[in-house]
From Swiss-Prot:
This is ATP synthase subunit beta. The keyword Cell inner membrane does not apply. The gene is atpD. It is a peripheral membrane protein. Belongs to the ATPase alpha/beta chains family. SMART domains: AAA (SM00382). Produces ATP from ADP in the presence of a proton gradient across the membrane. The catalytic sites are hosted primarily by the beta subunits. Its main location: membrane. It is an enzyme of class 7 (translocase).
Length: 468
């Protein structure tokens, strides 16, 4: 085990000098610095660059407070390794695989795997055309998710990405009954804490491993924590042959941390100040999140869109890797429609007649057509009013508004805030409800009866309460 000495510390960047004759550590190797002679507290560094003349530049995974020049640094000879296997279920980890849930720490002999690996080869990959039911109408009808697929939840600040991902955990993890891995990348600690206690109460935690590298962590930890969660998920897929659900909140923070690290390493920034290696880093992460012949990984990733600009390089780079996109729209939040999923901008590879069936496809296409036409008529309505529309257009607008409200529903995880019980709607019920609205069966019911409800039966019950 070769050793060097700290030459300089610049924030989270630590330069380490290895004497002549000492073997230099490889890129991505983990180095360890002990803060005192008793060797109780250590700081882990990851090698990022070799500067020449025995000097390597590293990124710290923890705060560098207390590090000084001349301190001894040991090369572990391998990348950061984290615990894997059944023992990780029900536990909460940080980027290094240390437990942070105040329960017993992992034993030294627990099985560990390095966080840096190659993606599965082309012939190992497997594709599926099985739909993953979420119980959320707007998703199941217009942008369905594939089992073993990749889903992106796009949205600006405060439009409901985390609430949607928590509802998906609530619905899918409980229905799915398999293994789930939740990775919190650079998000609020409070949200992670809420999610942990909620999962503990519901019992889902027993089949879930949680990994957190939150907003207050150094950029190195935020950049690598997604790989820690992915390594745990890969083990269940490859060794245990399981179907795994991988939730990542938020992929943008992974990019943001990479940008910070890139600047600290002295690389020339690229477009909008992002790192020049943006596409490579995203590709290395996303290509590992895949399904093989041994097992599947279904990933649901929240992706923050800076200033609601979808052309920003960070969300634009993520787009290329996804099977389904669920776009959250601020205008719908302003209308009080939750989840604020844009039915026209969201898309899915799975919305094809050979996958979802002819009836589902036809209903989804007609819903999109009606909403698109309503969108076109809104300018005329705003300038000239409803009176200038033909009778046919008035009927279409009335149905479009009912459809728009019926695409909303109350969430189980938001019940504590709204006071309204959440609902889970099976796909068959969703398709039937929208088909009947399109057929004009409920033209006589008030628009408000369609807002925030589950199935079409709930609409009828709500309308009866309103006196219709």
């Amino acid at each position: 085990m070769s050793s060097g000495k700290i030459a300089q510390v610049i924030g989270p960047v630590v330069d380490v000098l290895f004497a002549a004759g000492e073997k230099l550590p490889e890129i991505n190797n983990a180095l360890v610095v002990y803060k005192n002679d008793e060797r109780k507290t250590k700081i882990v560094l990851e090698v990022a660059l070799e500067l020449g003349d025995g000097m390597v530049r590293t990124i710290s995974m923890e705060s560098t407070d207390g590090l000084t020049r001349g301190m001894e640094v040991l090369d572990t000879g391998r990348p950061i390794s984290v615990p894997v296997g059944k023992e990780t279920l029900g536990r909460v980890f940080n980027v290094l695989g240390d437990t942070i849930d105040l329960e017993a720490p992992f034993t030294e002999d627990a099985e560990r795997q390095p966080i840096h690996k190659k993606a599965p080869t082309f012939d190992e990959l497997s594709t599926s055309s099985e739909i993953l039911e979420t119980g959320i109408k707007v998703i199941d009808l217009l942008a369905p998710y594939l089992k073993g697929g990749k889903v992106g939840l796009f949205g600006g600040a405060g439009v409901g990405k985390t609430v949607l991902i928590q509802e998906l955990i609530h619905n899918i993890a409980q229905e799915h009954g398999g293994i789930s891995v939740f990775t919190g990348v650079g998000e609020r600690t409070r949200e992670g804490n809420d999610l942990y206690w909620e999962m503990k109460e519901s019992g889902v935690i027993e089949k879930t491993a949680m990994v957190f590298g939150q907003m207050n962590e150094p950029p190195g930890a935020r950049m690598r924590v997604a790989l820690t969660g992915l390594t745990i998920a890969e083990y269940f897929r490859d060794v245990e042959g399981q179907d795994v659900l991988l939730f990542i909140d938020n992929i943008f923070r992974f990019t943001q941390a990479g940008s910070e690290v890139s600047a600290l390493l002295g690389r020339m920034p690229s477009a909008v100040g992002y790192q020049p290696t943006l596409a490579t880093e995203m590709g290395q992460l996303q290509e590992r999140i895949t399904s093989t012949k041994k097992g599947s990984v279904t990933s649901i990733q929240a992706i923050y869109v800076p200033a609601d600009d979808y052309t920003d390089p960070a969300p634009a780079t993520a787009f290329a890797h996804l099977d389904s996109t669920t776009n959250l729209e601020r205008k719908l939040v302003q209308l009080g429609i939750y989840p604020a999923v844009d039915p026209l901008a969201s898309s899915s590879r799975a919305l094809a007649p050979e996958i979802v069936g002819e009836e589902h496809y036809a209903v989804a296409a007609e819903v999109k057509r009606v909403l698109q036409r309503y969108h076109e008529l809104q300018d005329i309505i705003a300038i000239l009013g409803m009176d200038e529309l033909s009778d046919e257009e008035k009927t279409l607008v009335a149905r479009a508004r009912r459809i728009q409200f019926f695409l909303s529903q109350n969430f189980n995880v938001a019940e504590q805030f709204t006071g309204q019980p959440g609902s889970y709607v099976p796909v068959a019920e969703t398709v039937r409800g929208f088909k009947e609205i399109l057929d004009g069966k409920y033209d006589h019911l008030p628009e408000d009866a369609f807002r925030g409800v589950g199935s079409i039966e709930d609409v009828i019950a709500k309308a009866e309460k309103m006196g219709f």
